[in-house]
Structure formats: structure tokens, C-alpha cells
């Protein structure tokens, strides 16, 4: 039996996606403006940055802004985090009411101390029993909120997916128990970032764990891989070596939404072409203008300083540009900085 092509469609519950290159939920980056330019460059599925279940239940407006659908987003996932099953269930209902998103993802991997100490994030990977209760509660909540079909039969309940880590520390590797708990509770897909909570984002992710998870799940639900994907060749290698159904770009996509287009080209044709500097900067401006429309010019210009720093990488004599970027406060400032590169 021949192997399927590396680039292929993926289904998450009732969601049918054209390909298997995803944008991960990344705090401080995965807003609707950035997701939209990733989609334009070939991202097949996108996730919001993580949203606090507690804040949703308290009706925090800032939190609701994080969940907005991008202008070109036909399907997306809202990622929520929390450690209390009842609160997570209520948050899931609010998410569906406010966004009508196609998928809800549960964060069981964030290593940030202020998240972990509440029993959320990677604390759930360490505690499979609580993880089961959280996922079960969210799955039960969304099954009671079946979306209305645009036409034809009902699409069924919104799928719930789970993102885990390999464990708490090297002496406490619990991914297998966490994944089994997620499956038993009704998760429709599992993403794994095979680093421990103690590692944070240091060292290397252990891709051999992905292969073991794929074998353990045995096709019951799709498995997605995340960790150390910084160039198209990394994605190709992960798909070949681990057998995951999809790869999820995080830091590798920051300031580089072109990684989706480049990876698609590599997987389907065996090669890809470098993105011209002009296109990189034009894409940065598209993101800037969308972010300003979603929030404010002031917020967008401050936020885009770090992003334009990434967009300008590889531009000859880019040092002076990046020094000027950290002072940019208006859209006009950015135009002056990049005058000559846009047209």
C-alpha cells in the first residue's frame, strides 16, 4: 500500500480541510490580522491565541476581541485555557455563541507559570484525570449547542481538540496518559508539542514521541505535530519521520507567513522560491492596516514593531531599517521607513 502524499486533506470531526499546514495559537501574534495574511499565504487552518475561560465567563471585552474571525477565515479554532471543568464548559458555550467558530481547542500545554499555577496549561498534561474532566465537560457543553446549518442537514456538534506537551519534566513524562484521557473524553484531534513544561521553549522537541502518539492513536483521530518548525524542510521532515496528519507552525511563522506557501510548494513540487523583499514588506503593511482596523492605529503600530523586524530580515542593509522601526508610531512612519521598497 502506497503512502499518501505529504500534502493532503485533513478532517477534524465534521471539518474538512484542503491541506495539512496549520497556524498554531501563539500569544501576542495569532490575532485576526496575522491569521488573515497566513491564510492568504497558504495556511489551511488557524487558531486564535489562547483565551482565558475565566475572563470569558466574566465577560471581559478584551478577551472577546481575541476570538474575532479573520476576514477570510472560512474555518478556524478558538483556543481556551482553564483548569475548572464547569468554567471551561461555560466558556465553550460563550465561544460558540459569540463566534460560531468551527472548532474549540483546549490548551493543555502552556508552560507559563501564571497559567500553570491555576491548574491550566501544562498542569493538565501532568494531571490526566483533571484533563479528562475538563475535556469531557467541554465536549458535553458543545454537544448541547449544535450549530444551525446554512443549508442541508445539521453539521453536528463542534469538534473539540486538545493540545498537550510531553510531560511536566523529564522524570514525569505523561503524554501517553494525557492523550488517552483526551481520547476517552471525546476529543476529535490531538496536537502534541513534545517538550516538557520544564523545558519551556528551550532545547529540542522530541519528535520520536509524535511517532509513538500516532501509533497509539492508530487512526482514531488525527494527530498534529508542533515544535521546531522553522523552515519548510522541517515540516517535510516531521511529516516523513513521525506520520503526523498535519504540522502546526508557531514561532517559525512569526513575521514569516510565507512559510505556508513555501512548504506547500516544497511538499508538492520539491522546491520553492525565496520571497522577494518587496512582497515581504507589502504583506507586513497589509497586516498593519488590518490590525489598525481591528484595534487602533496606535496599538497596531506598537505591535507591528516586532513583526516588521521579522519581515525585514534578509533585506540588504536592513540594520538601519530595524533601528527606525522601533521608533515607528504611525502608519505614515512605517511608509517613510520603507519608502522605496513598497513599489
Enumerate the language-model features and the residues they cover.
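Alpha/beta enzyme core
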Residues: 93-120, 127-146, 155-223
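Glycine-rich, positively charged N-terminal anion/phosphate-binding segment
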Residues: 2-11, 26-102
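N-terminal small/glycine-rich loop or linker at the start of catalytic domains
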Residues: 10-21, 57-75, 110-118, 157-166
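Hydrophobic faces of well-ordered beta-strands that scaffold small-molecule active sites
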Residues: 21-24, 46-48, 76-80, 104, ...
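Active-site mouth loops of central-metabolism enzymes
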Residues: 19-29, 76-88, 124-125, 162-175
